[in-house]
């Protein structure tokens, strides 16, 4: 992928008030996107957002920029990212825009785009938008200005879509489910989906106030969910992130079930139902235990770079339909065009109903190897990964693992972080080794 000035692996993201997440930049971005997208014919753009307080400001800026370029905006209000992808397709809009920083704190926000078919914008379109950003802003003639409206039934449309991905001959009657919606975009969607399918639903993280999104809740912090599942004697728990494109689950014992385990269960079920096309795609961060478990089932497995867009690219290259990240992004191309936490969770619930098995038992065919991830924040222009000391210590750790584990160092695509991952057979050892490398990264440069 070429070096781009603004777009990262998941759109444009940053701290609100700091460049580039400022009202003037986002207005210019809306205008530039409008200029590029208007060339393709349709003049309607769907705009959704999560529950961050800054969403109001940024959607107004986007609307102004798009209108100046002659495009109209249709607002969904707070809506999961995959819902915007779905609505973009069903409304035949030229593009969808999501205002969200996903799992980040409330003071961050971001802008990401979907194309007319509900997939991430191609690199060349993002590059064209960046090129347009360098030009002076102009305004179309008054008669050609864009308009704005709200899609009043957006939530209901998406709820019905989600329910449609669950087998019609099944129901969730008799299942008690705890939902953690991260005080984010799924707060008014997921509880209704599961209740309408018959579940007894207990909710947490469903009271967004603009600043509590992802705060000690949701897919990135399931401790409260684990506690509530056990307290409520629930069958299962589901946690979504702030924009609803990922899911992490908790079994009836309070044990966390991550994206690798979710991918394993869905792949095994698809194989048993004769619905698995080819193999499945994970990432460089996927646990070795997933690879080994899939190998036992005879299911081909490939690793993509980290990022759901790269999982999707690999699936398209191979002509396969199923992929996931261990963070909980699950892509089911037979049902959706992008990661969808609610839809992925429904497939696991369906497997529980079909097999009359608990989530804990469904996971029993796969053993996760100990894996430790340490995030190290860095600043400045130096690249810690090029430090001679970091390189040497990483090599010594690989020697110590002696072929019975993995080491991965990579830059985050959305934050100024170096992610240090060490995987092996012994939990204590991999923890110590990961922190040894992290200390070297911290002091590099």
From Swiss-Prot:
Cofactor binding summary note: Binds 1 Mg(2+) ion per subunit.
Active-site residues, as the UniProt record annotates them: 102 (phosphoserine intermediate)
Residue numbers carrying Phosphoserine: 102
Post-translational modification: Activated by phosphorylation.
GO biological process, one term: UDP-N-acetylglucosamine biosynthetic process
Entries under SUPFAM superfamilies matching the protein: Phosphoglucomutase, C-terminal domain (SSF55957), Phosphoglucomutase, first 3 domains (SSF53738)
EC code: 5.4.2.10
Domain of life: Bacteria
Catalysis: reaction(s): alpha-D-glucosamine 1-phosphate = D-glucosamine 6-phosphate
A Pfam family it matches: PGM_PMM_II
Molecular-function annotations in GO: magnesium ion binding; phosphoglucosamine mutase activity; phosphomannomutase activity
Family under the similarity heading: Belongs to the phosphohexose mutase family.
HAMAP family given in the database record: GlmM_B
Stated name of the protein: Phosphoglucosamine mutase
Species: Photorhabdus laumondii subsp. laumondii (strain DSM 15139 / CIP 105565 / TT01)
